[in-house]
Amino acid sequence: GPCNVVDGVAIDVNPSIYEAGIPVIAAGHDKATCAVKLPQFTDDIEAIKAAVKPFVFETCKAEANWNMTNFVNDQVELVRRQVGNRKVLLALSGGVDSSVVAALLLKAIGDNLVCVHVNHGLMRKGESEDVVEMFGNQLKANLIYVDATERFLTKLEGVEDPEQKRKIIGGEFIRVFEEEARKLDGIDFLGQGTIYPDIVESGTKTAKMVKSHHNVGGLPEDLQFELVEPLRQLFKDEVRACGVELGLPYEMVYRQPFPGPGLGVRCLGAITRDRLEAVRESDAILREEFRIAGLDKKVWQYFTVVPDFKSVGVRDNARSFEWPVIIRAVNTIDAMTATIEPVEWPILMKITDRILKEVKHVNRVCYDMSPKPNATIEWE
């Protein structure tokens, strides 16, 4: 139903309107009815603001007093109230969400934050090393490094279903944290970088489930921690603004998003180590060439996937039967919708040439042209 209802006012409306999948604002003002229907699939933030502004500020007499400084101060106070003098264990992947959560929790509780970086073997090339350097050496955070590569890959052997992979990875993450917590004294809370799109896409009473998110749907029933999720009200662009407000460096705040399950949802189907390596190496080439071309600051998210089937090709004047690599590059404002980035052909040709020459067991490169919707940003 509606998020807010005025006391004493009956809501005389067909309840199915709240399950229609279309954003709707409706209000009864005296005997007049005011409603705003927003464009369902658009990244035009200014158009959305123009549609909502008269209703919010003229009809409802709202005041424009929300800003990121106030949000940070409010969340710091809320975290202090929730946690007190106890300790929080944070899953620090080094991505935007977990980095901003770490900075916010450090501001709120200081040394009572214990950061754990788990290398599950599904990280991008050199990423775990970067996390240790940035957080352990530069930011001087209380950082514990856990190499759980063999543990995760063994659990994932033969698992094809993407939902099952996500739940295995999410559940194993929590169990690793539980084990680390037993080695420490007084860990009562688990910090998470859950943001608003995670909540929406994982399903609510009024939203159909799209996919389970690593921060939401993978938690096991025997979870022994109380959750601390200070970013759950924010969209991705607001998370970045929060990071800037907290003083994090540009390269950390504006790095491209990376899913919790990592390359596990980009090595499609059952994960094999050789195909996982093909994803990692092709992704590294794509990121390097996008940086050289200046696209790393223009494109919101870009990555490669390797499916669990092969294609016929020619290598060294002989028939080859090897994997394709699929490139995906999208732009979005809030991660709820996404458009395709029209990358220039010379750049794509250079990337293709490098992947075919440098990545083992690959004989074909494709470019994904599917927007969100109908496709999601990730393949799994």
Label the model's feature ranges.
Residues G1-D188, P197, G203-E380:
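RNA-binding accessory domains that recognize and position tRNA/RNA substrates
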Residues Q192-T194:
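Extended catalytic-interface subdomain
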